[in-house]
C-alpha cells in the first residue's frame, strides 16, 4: 500500500507543484522488482492525470493566476510558458504528447490546454500515452541496465549509480532551463 500511495502522490505533485519527476521513484523500484515498478507506473499515471485535470481546470478558469504560480516553480520561467503556449496554439492537443517528451513540464501543457479551450476528453486521452510512455520506458531501461550491464554490482551499488545518474541529470537540466 505504501508504494501505491507514494506513486499516486508523486504523480499528482509533479503534475501540479513539484519539479522532480516520478521517474526517480520508478527507476529505483525497477532496480529490485520490475513488476512492482511497472504497477507503480500505473499509479503514478493516476496521480498525474488527477494533477493534470486540476491544472487544466485552473488554466481554464484563471490563466493569469496559473502562470504566476507556475513561474514560482524551479526551472519554469515566462520564456518557457511562452514556448508552450505557442506550441499549444500551433499543434493543439498534440503538443501535450510531444512537449513533455522534450523535457517541458506536463503541468504547463495542462494549464494551457485548459486555457485554449482544448476539449477535456481529448486532453485526457492524449495525456495517458504522453505520461505512461516515458514512465514505462525509463523503468524498462533501468531494469535492463541493472540486470544486464550491472549484474556484478550489489543492489546498493546499483542504487548509488542510479543516484549519480539522477544528480547528473538534474544538474544538467537546471543548468539549461
Model-derived regions, located:
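Membrane-interfacial segments
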Residues: 29, 33, 62-74, 145, ...
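Final/C-terminal transmembrane alpha-helix of multipass membrane proteins
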Residues: 158-177
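Hydrophobic alpha-helical membrane segments of integral membrane proteins
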Residues: 2-43, 85-148, 172-175
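Membrane helix-loop-helix hairpins that form the core translocation module of multi-pass transporters
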Residues: 38-82, 86, 90-94
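Hydrophobic transmembrane alpha-helix bundles
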Residues: 41, 60-65, 78-80, 134-144, ...
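Membrane-interfacial entry segments at the cytosolic side of transmembrane helices
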Residues: 39-42, 152-162
